[in-house]
Amino acid sequence: MKHGAGGRSMRLLIEQVLVDRTSPIANVMDDGAAIPLGDEWLIVTTDSHVIHPLVFPGGDIGRLAVAGTVNDLAMMGATEPLGLTCGLILEEGFPLDDLKTIRSSMERTCTEAGAPIVSGDTKVMGRGEVDGLVLNTTGVGIARRVVRDSGLKPGDLLIVTGTLGDHGIAVMAARHQLDLGGALQSDVAPLNSLIRAALLAGGDGISAMKDPTRGGAASALHEMAEKSGVGIQLDERALPVRDEVRAAAELLGLDPLMIANEGKALLGVHPDAADIVLRAVRAHPLGRDAAVIGVCSGELRGSVVLDTGFGRRLLTEPDGELLPRIC
């Protein structure tokens, strides 16, 4: 299970076994493929969703599938999706009313994101051969400029567009029927309009983007640092975490930096553009809690260092079954 939970094991599986080394497009290993199309780029991304439970506070597998694919497109600069495909694998006997509810949720999220479902496929397997429902979505969009997760430069500031750990904690509480107090809600949401606003404000001053899903911000930042050849220093005191999420994480022995998010983005921004980008993000309903959380340097390349206010320590890359089946 750890090879699908995000973090080092999953990254190594993809790098060493799954990626097509003969393809210069696939070998980049970003959130999607960028295919040249005249003076623009066709961005293609795909994602399969196996979350348990299928419905959780703040969302469900349908909203998650649409938002996750739209967000992967947006992270590469394609903020106006052309369309999505949807593949369903259903377990025999799956309740029709539940399927209608999930389908309605997908439709609402597609409308929210401006991303129509243009094609699909449905398969049914026997009882016990699949756990309820597996949902795959593929998305395509056009980008005028591709933004890679490998574009960080020394001196760039790191902005997170909101609070960390909301999705993972909400799903974990629902899965195990934990009464952790407070209003725990997933943050699952399509971010393309927020990212569009950030790109309009910051232009080329935005050097890199990534959504911190499986493995949380820690996994995403490690990947960005390694690909970009920079070191990252985080300010722990600047990390936005809701009180109820922090309390639940402490109770469960989890680090909010390693907990999945489904409605947040990490932006690498040139210092000259940081203020205007931060203002643009905070002006969006999904970015009100955005914060500058760190800076890139030429030291300790490929590493992430956490400044706690009392000292500094290396932030390890997540590995293992922290929160399996979280998306």
Short names for language-model regions:
Residues 5-166, 171, 180:
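Glycine-rich phosphate/pyrophosphate-binding loop regions near the starts of catalytic domains
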Residues 29-30, 259-264:
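Short Gly/Ser/Thr- and Asp/Glu-enriched loop/turn motifs at secondary-structure junctions
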Residues 69, 102, 106, 221, ...:
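Aromatic/hydrophobic pocket-lining residues that form π-stacking "cages" and hydrophobic walls in ligand
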Residues 91-94, 184-261:
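Active-site-proximal betaalpha loop/short-helix elements
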Residues 109-110, 225, 249, 281:
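A generic structural signal for well-ordered alpha-helical segments
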Residues 269-275:
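Helix N-cap motif at beta-to-alpha junctions
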Residues 276-286:
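Short amphipathic alpha-helices in soluble, non-transmembrane regions
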Residues 284-327:
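Acidic, Ser/Thr/Pro-rich beta/coil linker or hinge segments at domain junctions
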